[in-house]
Regions:
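Extracytoplasmic catalytic/substrate-binding loops of multi-pass membrane glycan-assembly enzymes
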Residues: 35-48, 61-76, 83-87, 234-241, ...
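Signature aromatic-anchored transmembrane alpha helix within multi-pass, membrane-resident enzymes
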Residues: 18, 22, 117-120, 173, ...
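Transmembrane-helix motifs of polytopic, lipid-linked glycan transferases
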Residues: 91-112, 147, 151
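Membrane-lumen/periplasm interface segments of specific transmembrane helices
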Residues: 28, 208-302
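Short helix- or helix-capping micro-motifs
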Residues: 25, 121-130, 134, 154, ...
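Short acidic/glycine- and proline-prone juxtamembrane loop motifs at membrane-interface regions
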Residues: 41, 66-67, 137-144, 348
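Membrane-embedded, lumen/periplasm-facing catalytic core of multi-pass transferases
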Residues: 54, 108, 156, 386-437, ...
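Transmembrane alpha-helix segments characteristic
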Residues: 16-23, 120-122, 126, 170-173, ...
């Protein structure tokens, strides 16, 4: 055992670690962008909104995206650096992700991980786990949310050890910053007084009253959060803030209607007429199954096992109040996730980023416990083999977050080729936002459709009289049917085909006037 790693990390050592983390984080972002230089679909939406904001068209920006702060941040970065909005998004996220890594290390230290070894382990987890690296090439708002969330959590854990007002202010500022990027930040912001009260070392006298108040706040926040997930972009008006009761009433009606529709689908398509009475039970079981499976997918199996191991053993946090606060944060995340699942009956992996990062705060202490405090000889041969397999598996999963080479290069190539042919507004129709973006026609919203079926129906109704080119993105199985359909029905042959590696094709057609 190297005793130098057991001693407390002084200021110089901490600054060296944070500096190295910043450099490595920027390098990882540059690498991920290099191997996946094709914009993501959400990125196209944010760029559209930023372009509207640049023109002072706030109404138009809100009609495109109902949470405009991230596009505004991209706009500011673009103006300051003088680069395009796509590059501005990459620069902003690279900086934000570097801040996330640094805040993760600082939060682990706030939990009691002040030794050199724990500081290095925290940096290692923050740099290699897929939750931090999988989305480095994406233009998304989640890094900004994680910065604010982790800042709030950092000050919350500092408050657990020393109840100073400045730490509470830090909690509010952090969660308020998080709410600029994702609405979940508002949930933590409004629940911060409850989280603070639960950090008290003395028993809370009115525990029943506090529990009732917390339940009411949780239900109201979950209702508004669910309504926000359901309401389409462009349907949000500034005037809604004047009638919060109407918001809650409308939200509850829409959520109840959505849940009833999903239960009806379960009754009609999954259960027979004699089993329809079990639809509510099936729906109730589906929710935790989706949360658990998505959690394992996001954390990955080896890291999930390490988290469970940490839950079963002493966390290693500085005190039990911090451990209790960590559990409260996890429960609050689960409430948010359950709300999403109840409404949508699915979860996107990156919805769990906040939950995953909170869970990963436990991992450095688990690794320190296994590698530092427990002797290798204490494990029998089977446990030694399992530990080695688990660690190697964890490293393999971490590497997988850094080898996401793009499979959509053909979309970019097709769009760039079309850019020279479709300079006039309305001249391109496509079923893919990325192709339209690289063609410079992403602002023609009416000409970008979600599927080939909608595109074909629009052609029948002559919906796009100014269109000169059609770009159809299809998978390998569907492409042959589409080619045959255009040949027989429309008498068109594709003039250009861009093929992707196991990712389908882009068929280019030129319309005859």
């Amino acid at each position: 055992m190297n005793l130098s790693f057991d001693q407390s990390a002084d200021r110089g050592f901490l600054l060296w670690v944070l500096g190295a983390c910043t450099v490595l984080s920027v390098a990882l972002s540059a690498w991920c962008i290099y191997i996946d230089d094709v914009i993501n679909n959400d990125g196209v939406e944010y760029i559209r909104a930023a372009e509207r904001l640049a023109l002072g068209d706030w109404t138009g920006a809100l009609s495109l995206y109902k949470w405009p702060f991230y596009p505004l941040f991209m706009l500011i970065v673009g103006k300051v650096t003088g680069v395009g909005y796509q590059m501005a998004g990459h620069i902003a996220n690279s900086v934000l992700l570097s801040a996330v890594v640094a805040l993760f290390v600082l939060t682990v230290r706030a939990l009691g991980g002040t030794s050199r070894r724990l500081t290095l382990l925290a940096a290692l987890v923050a740099l290699i786990h897929p939750a931090f690296n999988e989305y480095r090439a994406f233009i998304i708002r989640d890094p900004g949310y994680l910065v604010g969330y982790l800042a709030g959590v950092y000050f919350l854990f500092r408050y657990c050890r020393c109840a100073r007002p400045r730490y509470y202010v830090g909690v509010l500022v952090g969660f308020a910053f998080a709410s600029l990027f994702r609405i979940e930040g508002l949930v933590f912001l409004f629940c911060s007084p409850i989280l603070i009260v639960l950090t008290r070392t003395q028993p809370v006298r009115s525990l029943g009253l506090l529990a009732t108040f917390a339940s009411i706040v949780g239900v109201l926040l979950a209702t508004v959060l669910g309504w926000w997930a359901l309401v389409p972009d462009g349907a949000v008006k500034f005037s809604i803030l004047s009638d919060p009761v109407q918001i809650i009433s409308t939200a509850w009606d829409q959520i109840a209607s959505g849940i009833n529709k999903k239960i009806s689908i379960l009754q009609q398509h999954f259960l027979g007429p004699f089993s329809a009475r079990y639809s509510y039970l099936l729906f109730g079981l589906t929710v935790p199954m989706i949360i658990v499976s998505t959690t394992i997918s996001q954390l990955t199996v080896p890291w999930f096992v390490l988290t469970v191991f940490g839950l079963r053993n002493d966390s290693g946090f500085a005190n039990h109040i911090q451990a209790r606060t960590w559990i409260n944060l996890m429960l609050l995340h689960l409430m948010i996730l359950a709300t999403f699942v109840l409404i949508m009956l699915f979860l996107v992996d990156r919805y769990l980023l906040g939950f995953s990062v909170t869970a990963l705060l436990l991992i450095p202490f688990v690794l320190d416990n296994v590698l530092g405090k427990l002797r290798w000889q204490d494990f029998n041969r089977l446990k030694q083999v399992l530990i080695v397999i688990l660690l190697l598996w964890g490293v393999g999963e971490s590497v997988s977050g850094l080898d996401n080479f793009t499979r959509h290069q053909h979309l970019k190539e097709a769009g760039l080729w079309l850019a020279g042919q479709t300079a006039i507004s309305g001249s391109l129709v496509s079923n893919d936002r990325k192709v339209a973006y690289y063609a410079g026609r992403h602002a023609d919203l009416e000409n970008i459709v979600p599927s080939f079926g909608v595109l074909n129906n629009g052609l029948k109704k002559k919906r796009w009289p100014e269109a000169e080119y059609i770009a159809v993105v299809c998978n390998l199985d569907l492409c042959q049917k589409i080619i045959k359909h255009f040949k027989i029905v429309w008498k068109y042959d594709q003039i250009k085909v861009f093929s992707g590696h196991k990712a389908g094709k882009v068929l280019i057609y030129r319309l005859r006037r």
